[in-house]
Every structure is written in structure tokens, then in C-alpha cells.
């Protein structure tokens, strides 16, 4: 499950690096807490991924500046908990996961309280301006804006349940 989440999220993040400035170390301190995934897109087909809904994601800053991301997602009718550790690099806003196999970036959005990352904002309400900013960033890197997925927000989803 971790590679699947990383394939979905991290490929997007890495592809969007050039659109915005990377978040500084000071800004990274603000990402700890609850975030809501507002939209996502990928650069390849993932037939095994049938994301129906996602609960709010919790980001926690760990010792040494690493980040832990946790969320529960309804995938193909089953709730599955996903946890990923993002390891800080020397470059502000840049992280690696899965022993360096994946590179992740936390990128500043033009919208307040939004980042281009796993999730887009701290509240569950969609912000059309933030979505437009996300679409521009995705389009600038050659990702199809037509394949952007906006998952249904759900408050709870227990692993193993449907």
C-alpha cells in the first residue's frame, strides 16, 4: 500500500517542483497538523488504485526534521491506513521516502494555508482558486488536468472496514 500512495502522491510532487518555490524550513514547521487532500493527479495509469474517499491526513514533524504522514483511505471498498515517513534532505522543502527511491517536495501554493503536496488545505471545503493554482502547476509539468481526482471527504474510515 505504501508504494501505491507514494506512486500517486510523490510522482505528482516531484513533477511540480519547478512551478512554485519550495517551502522553507520555517514554513515546514507550519505543516504539522491536520490537512485535507483536495485534489490529485498522476502521470501514469494506476488500474489497481480505486480511491473512493480519504480521511484528513495528519502530518507530524519528527526528530531531525523528518515528517510522518498518516491517513486512512477507502480504496476499492476497503478502508486502509497508510503511513509514510518522509526523510528531510539538505534542500529545504525536499524529502525522500522508501530509502531514497522517491523524492517529495513541499511546494508553496499561491493560496494561503495551501501547499502542493499530499494534501491541499487544512479545511475540507474546496477552494476554487487553490484548485486552479493546482491545475496550472500540474499542467505546467505536462500532467493532464483532465485526470485530476477530487476525492470525497470522510471523517472516519477504520482499517479493514468498508
From Swiss-Prot:
| Highest rank taxon of the organism | Eukaryota
Signal sequence interval, chain numbering: 1-18
Q: Where in the cell is it found?
A: Secreted
MF terms from GO for this chain are: small molecule binding
Which of UniProt's keywords are assigned here?
Secreted, Signal
GO terms for CC? extracellular space
Known CDD domains for this protein? lipocalin_1_3_4_13-like (cd19414)
Q: Which Pfam families match?
A: Lipocalin
Q: What does this protein do?
A: May bind a variety of ligands including lipids.
Q: Which family does it belong to?
A: Belongs to the calycin superfamily. Lipocalin family.
Specify the protein name. Putative lipocalin 1-like protein 1
Q: State the encoding gene.
A: LCN1P1
Amino acid at each position: 500500500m505504501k508504494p501505491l500512495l507514494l506512486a500517486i502522491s510523490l510522482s505528482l510532487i516531484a513533477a511540480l517542483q519547478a512551478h512554485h518555490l519550495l517551502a522553507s524550513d520555517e514554513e515546514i514547521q507550519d505543516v504539522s497538523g491536520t490537512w485535507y487532500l483536495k485534489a490529485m493527479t498522476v502521470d501514469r495509469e494506476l488500474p489497481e488504485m480505486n480511491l473512493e474517499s480519504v480521511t484528513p491526513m495528519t502530518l507530524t514533524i519528527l526528530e531531525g526534521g523528518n515528517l510522518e504522514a498518516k491517513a486512512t483511505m477507502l480504496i476499492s471498498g476497503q478502508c486502509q491506513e497508510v503511513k509514510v515517513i518522509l526523510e528531510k534532505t539538505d534542500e529545504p522543502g525536499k524529502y525522500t521516502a522508501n530509502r531514497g527511491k522517491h523524492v517529495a517536495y513541499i511546494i508553496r501554493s499561491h493560496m494561503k494555508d495551501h501547499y502542493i503536496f499530499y494534501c491541499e488545505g487544512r479545511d475540507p471545503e474546496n477552494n476554487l482558486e487553490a484548485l486552479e493554482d493546482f491545475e496550472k502547476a500540474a499542467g505546467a509539468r505536462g500532467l493532464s488536468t483532465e485526470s485530476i481526482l477530487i476525492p470525497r471527504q470522510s471523517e472516519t474510515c477504520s482499517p479493514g472496514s468498508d
